[in-house]
Amino acid sequence: LHSTSRRQRQMCIRDSIKAVDDYADLLRISVASAGNDHRLGANEAPPAVVSIFLGDELTEVLKAIENDEFFVGHGAVQMDIGAKVLPHFVKDNTDRNRTSPFAFTGNKFEFRMLGSSSSVANPNIILNTAVAEVLSQFYEELKDVPADGMESAVHELLKKTIKEHKRIIFNGNGYTDEWIEEAEKRGLYNLVSTPDALPHFTDEKNEKLLTSHHIFTHAELHSRYEIKLENYVKTLHIEAGTMVEIIQKDLLPAVTTYMEKLAQTAALKKSVVPDISVSAEAALLTRLTELSETMVKDLERLKEDTAMAEYEVDKNLLKSAKLYQSVVLTDMEKVRVSADAAEALIPDSILPYPTYGKLLFSISD
């Protein structure tokens, strides 16, 4: 943006703000996947609510334009690093916000919602098409304006756009519950999961956007909707089945083996010293028994609910996806609680697979 005029920069930002606000649901859909649902809103990833970060100074510039005020910048601020021997330098006035899905940094916008395993093509398609649509709308509004009135018309259009779409601008912490509440008050989408987002793919305004610009036909649009749903369902079906297999074939046998060793140790101690305490072994044996019983019970529920969700695949794919998201994932989280607790009590030598500690911190030949 540095190579363009001030008015062109303002128009570029205006176009982006309107495009993101009008088609925030499509941007969320473009990054929707089972894996990305886990990522968004945590681990330095942006939240599922689409918003734009402009930084304090640029936001003040737009506010001044909206109110027909003259913007007075704060000037260059020296960075205080607390060391006199190091050179002084000017603080970056664009600042940074790693919790923003769509952030302006320096001279560009960054879209940060895309997961590492997904193609950048999908958000590129949506962003480029949305901006093209906005430019087309603005062209229709300005095409009959005489040359001597163009500057004033562009300024008024800029003011109007800021007033209508400033709700999408948010420079705060996107992880807080307060922002989620504020986003709902502003009327922004909060599409937490893929099954929440995908039905909007075929909304009338979205279908009109993508078909009018000859990006997709009606059939292509609906086929992509179904393919995305099917991929989501298949991914969670595989994950649920993998969890069942790991628990049944690996973890539960390991728990049983360790409980057997504990019982043998306690019996051996008693055979040598009849009055010796085996309370530690007994307590650990009791705890592992409780955890294994809970695991078996939760695992049966997981298998039943997975079968129920899978039954709906051919009848109602969206219903199946919602069952996987709201029921099967919840079951998996419950199984995970008792499984993680049991793993923490079992020696590494008995577990048939590496622990997180070994995976993260050990180096094997």
Model-derived regions: residue spans:
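Single conserved hydrophobic/aromatic residue that forms the stacking wall/gate
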Residues: 2-9, 13
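A generic structural motif
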Residues: 6, 114-121
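Active-site loops and adjacent core secondary-structure elements that bind or stabilize anionic groups
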Residues: 11-12, 145-152, 156
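Polar, glycine-rich mid-to-C-terminal structural blocks
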Residues: 14-74, 78
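Generic beta-strand/beta-sheet core signal
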Residues: 29-32, 82, 89, 105-107, ...
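Conserved alpha/beta core surface patches that mediate binding of polyanionic ligands
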Residues: 83-103
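Structured core elements
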Residues: 85, 101-103, 108-112, 243-252, ...
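C-terminal amphipathic alpha-helical interaction region
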Residues: 161-365
